Curated annotation (Swiss-Prot):
Gene3D superfamilies, per the entry: Nucleic acid-binding proteins
Oligomeric and partner information: Part of the 30S ribosomal subunit.
The protein's name: Small ribosomal subunit protein uS17
SUPFAM superfamilies the UniProt entry points to: Nucleic acid-binding proteins
Organism name: Methylobacterium radiotolerans (strain ATCC 27329 / DSM 1819 / JCM 2831 / NBRC 15690 / NCIMB 10815 / 0-1)
Length: 87
């Protein structure tokens, strides 16, 4: 099964080698037929502490690093390639 890749915005980089990424999704409400936005925060591993608050980043599903951290930051050119592949 392929690993999921999500795009989101960094909302916190306070942790050591950890970032918090807000991922927003849109869907049509089944009854109201209106587009609804929902967001969720994911803790992701940032090995080099390179991501800063406000940046748009890609995160990839991976093995658990801790109780809440099961995503890792996709670095540089790999992120652009993944974005083109997902689109």
């Amino acid at each position: 099964m392929p690993k999921r890749i999500l795009q989101g915005t960094v909302v916190s980089d306070k942790g050591e080698k950890t970032i918090v990424v807000k991922v927003e999704r849109r869907f049509t409400h089944p009854v109201m037929k209106k587009t609804v936005r929902r967001s969720k925060n994911y803790h992701a591993h940032d090995e080099g502490n390179v991501a800063k608050v406000g940046q748009t980043v890609f995160i990839e599903e991976c093995r658990p690093f801790s109780k809440t951290k099961t995503w890792k930051l996709v670095e540089g050119d790999a992120a652009q390639a993944e974005a083109g592949e997902a689109a």
